[in-house]
Amino acid sequence: MRTEYCGQLNLSHVGQEVTLCGWVNRRRDLGGLIFIDMRDREGIVQVFFDPDHKAAYEQASELRNEFCIQITGTVRARPDSQINKDMSTGEVEIFANTLNIINRSEPLPLDSNQTNSEEQRLKYRYLDLRRPEMADRLKTRAKITSFVRRFMDSHGFLDIETPMLTKATPEGARDYLVPSRVHKGKFYALPQSPQLFKQLLMMSGFDRYYQIVKCFRDEDLRADRQPEFTQIDVETSFMTADQVREVMEKLVRELWQETKGVDLGDFPVMTFAEAMRRYGSDKPDLRNPMELVDVADLVKDVEFKVFSGPANDAKGRVAALRVPGGAQVTRKQIDEYGQFVGIYGAKGLAWLKVNDRAAGVEGVQSPIAKFLSAEVLEAILARTQAESGDILFFGADSFKVVTDAMGALRLKVGRDLALTKLDSWAPLWVVDFPMFEDDSEGGLSAMHHPFTAPKDMSPEQLAAAPTTAIANAYDMVINGYEVGGGSVRIHRTEMQQQVFGILGINEEEQREKFGFLLDALKFGTPPHAGLAFGLDRLVMLLTGTDNIRDVIAFPKTTAAACLMTDAPSFANPASLQELSISVVAKKGATDSSVEENQ
């Protein structure tokens, strides 16, 4: 039906007759001529209809936005005065000879001239995706996945599919369950990741595996989370953590070069402990130059209990954040920052403005200055490398509260005061995570997942001191986003059973949930390691949006609903009966449709 795409026409096509298919992006009448901007997947080109071509001209008078049309015409060069430098096709236009209105459009529920609500955009997603910026994002996504496949193929990785209907295993989030009609009362789980299957593929001898795969997690959603998401999943045998990182870093560097024309350079490597200490986050945004500076040793003996209390507590922390040029911040802004850190459990936010560094303590302004000696103030100014015009913010509380609150404040202030270089890229690897962390019930949970191997520990050593164990794990972070994470896996039965035991999984439960894995580990399992990238998050970064829904064709809302199809929906009672499922309404429920399905 077409000979060319609208957005690919240029001066090399001048004089050629072309047939185009697409949509009316805009129509306007000028001096007896009818002009339209015609749009397809590749872009927009201007088409004009002359009254001398009566049939096409009369039809063109009927055109409205989003009519689906086909035109045949001749490509002409625009006069210099009419060249549109904002369009890739701005040097040419089409003189239409024939017009075929394929399909008409009703008035749109979306307004192309203003910002529509996200609810409207998601409800009419098929119209929202016609917008060039949305189409460009999905085209970029397609190019990224194509590039990844070429790279992985060229490095000896095999694309192998793993099951979508599998067994529920504890991986940190709730599973989406699928009832079995054949096996009454039993349920499949949609995979949170292909973790165990890719490990089993290594045990099967496939050596290098990858897959671009859908994963499912029933968890609370944020702007960068979806209930169904896509991973670039990777696993290798006989490779160390350093070797895995080397190949995956090469993939990302080449991807950025291909997509953005940017050389990311070598990725620095930082331990988890260093990242938390300096930046208050295990995914630090290194575009922001500010760092947290520990000052507990300087304030241990001061009479100001807000500082000396945490400074003398083994589980406490006192940290300062120097904000270059921050003395301009108003008292109102400081109060707002105090409220902000309260979200993270901080009880307040102490501050100190450095008006004149050369004047020493006489050049500072702060409500806490009177509680600190000249020697302590000078020591704090020296350690933080404070300069005239700076402000220091202080956090003093438990290590977790201070780290979380000051880390979040660092990011907020960096954006508020334009200190974060938003037009740059700052990748790094974060390594040496704790193997375990405290859970809400007083036990331990795996910081990554229960199949991660510890660094340099035997099962006996791990059992004796689990809280000191360091995981052989690594995360790739770019601009404050964790874009990928992985680890060396446990490849011995004894170690895997020991980890399960530390996590409170008894032998009976181990056999019930992971018997197949424990059996497989007995048969010459090779050392193996892997990593998974969040494809959606990578595309989000590479297309410059801060909302993951912008890079998914048909995403869910933060309530895990599809406004376009009205999913999830109530099931037919006959289907539920066939599955031996009874829907029980919550106490106090008033939804009649729930009651009907009881």
From Swiss-Prot:
Region annotated Aspartate, chain positions: 195-198
EC number(s) from the headed UniProt entry: 6.1.1.12
Signal peptide from the UniProt entry: none
GO biological process: aspartyl-tRNA aminoacylation
An example molecular function term from Gene Ontology annotations: nucleic acid binding
Binding site for ATP: 217-219, 226, 482, 534-537
Keyword Nucleotide-binding: yes
GO cellular component, one term: cytoplasm
Keyword Protein biosynthesis: yes
InterPro entries per UniProt: Aa-tRNA-synt_II (IPR004364), aa-tRNA-synth_II (IPR006195), aa-tRNA-synth_II/BPL/LPL (IPR045864), Asp-tRNA-ligase_1 (IPR004524), Asp-tRNA-ligase_1_N (IPR047089), Asp/Asn-tRNA-synth_IIb (IPR002312), AspRS_core (IPR047090), GAD-like_sf (IPR004115)
Subcellular location per the Swiss-Prot or TrEMBL entry: Cytoplasm
Positions with a binding annotation for L-aspartate: 171, 217, 448, 489
The entry's keywords: Aminoacyl-tRNA synthetase, ATP-binding, Cytoplasm, Ligase, Nucleotide-binding, Protein biosynthesis
Top-level taxon of origin: Bacteria
Described purpose of this protein according to its UniProt entry: Catalyzes the attachment of L-aspartate to tRNA(Asp) in a two-step reaction: L-aspartate is first activated by ATP to form Asp-AMP and then transferred to the acceptor end of tRNA(Asp).
Name by which UniProt lists this protein: Aspartate--tRNA ligase
Protein encoded by which gene: aspS
